Each structure stands twice: as C-alpha cells, then as structure tokens.
Amino acid sequence: MSKWISLLKMKSKTFLDSLPSNFRNEKSFFIQNNLTDFEKLSNLSDLDINEIQRKSSLCTLNNLKKIRAIAIFKKEIGISPPQAYLLLHCGISSIKSLSLSTPYELERKVGRLEWILRVKNETGTTFSLLKEWIKKASQIDKSIWNLG
C-alpha cells in the first residue's frame, strides 16, 4: 500500500517541486505567475528572463538561466531535473555542449563531482545512460543544423 502512495506522490510532484531549494525565489515567482510547466519554462527567451529579473529582484539571472536549461534538458532529452542539475554542475549547460561531450568525459566529471561532494551517485546516471543522452543531444543538434 505504501508503494502506491509514494507512486502517487511522485506523480503529483511538479517540475518546480523537483528543483533544489536554492531556486526558492524563482520558484515562488513562477508559481505566482502560473509558469509551473517545464514546457513554458524551456521556451523562455533571454528577453523574458531579463523581464522576470526586472519584476522580481530576488530572482537571479544565473538561476533563471539554469532553470531554463534544466527545463530544456527535460523537454528535449527527457533528463530528470536532478540529473540535469548534475550536468550543469559538470559544466554541461546546453544541448550543444552535451552533444560535443563523450560518455567517458561525462562519467569522469560526474565521478569527480561526487568525490568532491563526498556523495554517491543518487541520480542513477550510468555510462549507458550518458551515452543515450549524448546520442539524443547529437541528433537534436544535427536536426537544428539541417533546418538552417
């Protein structure tokens, strides 16, 4: 029974709920302005982000751009917010930079970050998953270039 309850809780969790607490000001702004869907957040332009920062001085430019990047990773590749946040901490901030990475390089960066933070891999990122993400990112990157 408790397994079903935890599954229901997971389903009801929104994109914003899965973001770390250091985004609390941005989360508050998004909730107040009904911007809770990762699809909408992934489509924010730089102009939109600057406007949000102008309206709410507690929202930082850096955090707003990180949230947009996390939303893009989720929308385009299906990467969970915690996994996307891990990629950001490893220096991967876009589909393009992910497509140019190798699984070995990413595995090394993730391992180094975990060692520095003295944590185990809680996001479930495996070598094969890293390969899959890079493959998807490369396909997206190629399709963008083919449109132009």
Describe the function of each predicted region:
Residues 1-148:
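C-terminal extensions
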